[in-house]
Amino acid sequence: MYRYLGKALLLSRAGPAALGSAANHSAALLGRARGQPAAASQPGLALASRRHYSELVADREDDPNFFKMVEGFFDRGASIVEDKLVKDLRTQESEEQKRNRVRGILRIIKPCNHVLSLSFPIRRDDGSWEVIEGYRAQHSQHRTPCKGGIRYSTDVSVDEVKALASLMTYKCAVVDVPFGGAKAGVKINPKNYTENELEKITRRFTMELAKKGFIGPGIDVPAPDMNTGEREMSWIADTYASTIGHYDINAHACVTGKPISQGGIHGRISATGRGVFHGIENFINEASYMSNVGMTPGFGDKTFVVQGFGNVGLHSMRYLHRFGAKCVAVGESDGSIWNPDGIDPKELEDFRLQHGSILGFPKAKPYEGSILEADCDILIPAATEKQLTKSNAPRVKAKIIAEGANGPTTPEADKIFLERNILVIPDVYLNAGGVTVSYFEWLKNLNHVSYGRLTFKYERDSNYHLLMSVQESLERKFGKHGGTIPIVPTAEFRDSISGASEKDIVHSALAYTMERSARQIMHTAMKYNLGLDLRTAAYVNAIEKVFKVYSEAGVTFT
């Protein structure tokens, strides 16, 4: 249910007795709040003054509890959309009964449903034994299977996987991918283990998940995340298919992000970074948003900074560079580099592969200070959570913050960015490219055929016959006195009419998904007068979609 702190409408798990007076008080407060005029000239300030943040995260403003942080963002969206959900209910109930139903379903959506904690031994190459800790959280089963990555990091904790699992639920809803949210973590530093040891850990972790019913094509489908990739996903798929999924024809759909030879899909590796690019593209080309932050539309004259040169950071950098933006700085855990004339992503990638670090790159200088505070138009935090906090948010110079990482902005920092009219494109939308293409891979595995294979030659022949028909029509009309009238397509059109490959289909579908979701977020932000608060608009969209599933399915057996 809801509980109020100051002017903030918050969800809590308080008992019914404690909620009766709070419900009556909430209605009165909402009524008074709606009677106040909005400050249209500064939507960010108006929003900040109208809604406050949860006290659950305010006690540690620079290092809030990650899961409570996500719950706080959920609360903001729920407080805005509750009345609409009540109004849209088509049940033969009183207003009070409808409101109780809505609040009850919102209470179901918010918590993390299942958290599995594991410990298992492995024998290392030197003969010693080590106990490995791991977790898998399933936030919601409103849609199945659950979906979320597996990360290898010493920072993995129960709180982190719960937060990331809940983000996955809302992320999938924002981009209309029919999955519930999940996340897994293994508490290791992969740099301290050999490839043989990592394979042991990955395969044993897979078996532990399988024994507990936490993996399967229709149950729970992991994917790559921090410090994991195609190699680890291939080990997982092989382990599952060789054991518990031995008789399941869909066994390799138990995980996504696999190599092509193991049922993977073209475009998955770059999917999250490409999605970040498309997400930025949709807002940077929108004149109304650019005028609010004092920028001109388009990438042409824009500079950007990337924090984190991993999979997401690298591919985000590549696509922005390709479309005319200039990368002036890149930050990693061991240091940062700077070049106001621009850094070429391919050259930097080659240097990092050869030397193991971006430091020492000959075409850039070391950057002293925080890379998050570097002078640029677009800041892309693509590392870990809680990087932008109350302490450094006032010094951020970027006008657009594109959240490539999960949860990089704390609630207090988010509030400061709204007050400063900085456009934050939220993680719950922006880095959804990975799960979107994972969905395409999952469908490919269930259908047992690659995209384009059944139609590639048919489309190519159809387009060829169309051009020949046009040519023959022109020759019949004007004759052949000067010879034939060849129809010569341009290079771009020739590539298009040759037939869509799997990669073409994936890229096109991803671009469309990000565009459609961006339009939904813009519409919601305008509808509720949220100004630049795209995060709350995205959460409102997610809550509406998840709520509809629960409401129409019924909650008797939920």
UniProtKB/Swiss-Prot annotation:
InterPro entries referenced in this protein's UniProt entry, alphabetically: Aminoacid_DH-like_N_sf, Glu/Leu/Phe/Val/Trp_DH, Glu/Leu/Phe/Val/Trp_DH_C, Glu/Leu/Phe/Val/Trp_DH_dimer, Glu/Leu/Phe/Val_DH_AS, NAD(P)-bd_dom_sf, NAD_bind_Glu_DH
Major site of localization recorded for this protein: mitochondrion
Active-site residues (renumbered): 183
Gene Ontology molecular-function annotations: glutamate dehydrogenase (NAD+) activity; glutamate dehydrogenase (NADP+) activity
Cysteine pairs bridged by disulfides in the record: none
Alphabetical UniProt keywords: ADP-ribosylation, Mitochondrion, NADP, Oxidoreductase, Transit peptide
Residues modified as ADP-ribosylcysteine: 172
Compartment list: Mitochondrion matrix
Enzyme Commission code(s) on record: 1.4.1.3
Residues annotated as transit peptide in the record: 1-53
Family: Belongs to the Glu/Leu/Phe/Val dehydrogenases family.
Subunit structure: Homohexamer.
Protein name: Glutamate dehydrogenase 2, mitochondrial
Annotated organism of origin: Pongo pygmaeus (Bornean orangutan)
Gene for this chain: GLUD2
